Amino acid sequence: MASYSTNDFKPGLKFIQDGEPCVIVENEFVKPGKGQAFTRTKIRKLISGKVLEINFKSGTSVEAADVVDYNYTYSYKDEDFWYFMHPETFEQISVDAKALGDNDKWLVDQAECIITLWNGAAISVTPPNFVELAVVETDPGLKGDTAGTGGKPATLSTGAVVRVPLFVQIGEIIKVDTRSGEYISRVK
């Protein structure tokens, strides 16, 4: 099995830590004035989603994770599973709620998602960075009500709740960043 040295560490690198695939979120090489150099890393476990900070001594090796990312198109959902289709082979894959996490609120028909497979099983689903959704419920924006610049909550067609500016009305289509859950703009 392949392995990576701390010299190879960079954000996005996937490796095995405590028997679970992880991805490096941040890393920093530290050379203290006294003592051995080390690499300070922030990792996210792909199955549990936990974020940890771990220090590796300089030159330490870690086992590479046999993790593969594939592009799939969201098809439909039943009681227990969400189904995705490969755009070229038309092969379908089912994903359970644990692998999907809270990303189900960003799934719309035909959305291009990245599914991460480990040992042939789906362990995570990454929705597109931006989605366009309809506002189905929000408070009316009152004229002159600008004391709080935080906006107002709006419920979208998938059930997600985001903060939107006061001028957004029910029925409008808005663009949302799925990574942060923030309103980006209205769609013309």
Swiss-Prot record:
CDD domains: S1_EF-P_repeat_1, S1_EF-P_repeat_2. GO terms for molecular function: translation elongation factor activity. The modification N6-(3,6-diaminohexanoyl)-5-hydroxylysine is found at residue 34. It comes from the Bacteria. Pathway: Protein biosynthesis; polypeptide chain elongation. InterPro entries: Elong-fact-P_C, NA-bd_OB-fold, Rib_uL2_dom2, Transl_elong_fac_P/YeiP, Transl_elong_KOW-like, Transl_elong_P/YeiP_cen, Transl_elong_P/YeiP_CS, Transl_elongation_fac_P. It is found in: Cytoplasm. SMART domains: EFP, Elong-fact-P_C. Keywords: Cytoplasm, Elongation factor, Hydroxylation, Protein biosynthesis. One of its GO terms (biological process) is peptide biosynthetic process. Coiled coil: none annotated. May be beta-lysylated on the epsilon-amino group of Lys-34 by the combined action of EpmA and EpmB, and then hydroxylated on the C5 position of the same residue by EpmC (if this protein is present). Lysylation is critical for the stimulatory effect of EF-P on peptide-bond formation. The lysylation moiety may extend toward the peptidyltransferase center and stabilize the terminal 3-CCA end of the tRNA. Hydroxylation of the C5 position on Lys-34 may allow additional potential stabilizing hydrogen-bond interactions with the P-tRNA. Gene3D superfamilies: 2.30.30.30, Nucleic acid-binding proteins. One of its GO terms (cellular component) is cytoplasm. Belongs to the elongation factor P family. Involved in peptide bond synthesis. Alleviates ribosome stalling that occurs when 3 or more consecutive Pro residues or the sequence PPG is present in a protein, possibly by augmenting the peptidyl transferase activity of the ribosome. Modification of Lys-34 is required for alleviation. This is Elongation factor P. The lineage of its organism: Bacteria, Pseudomonadati, Pseudomonadota, Gammaproteobacteria, Pasteurellales. The gene is efp.
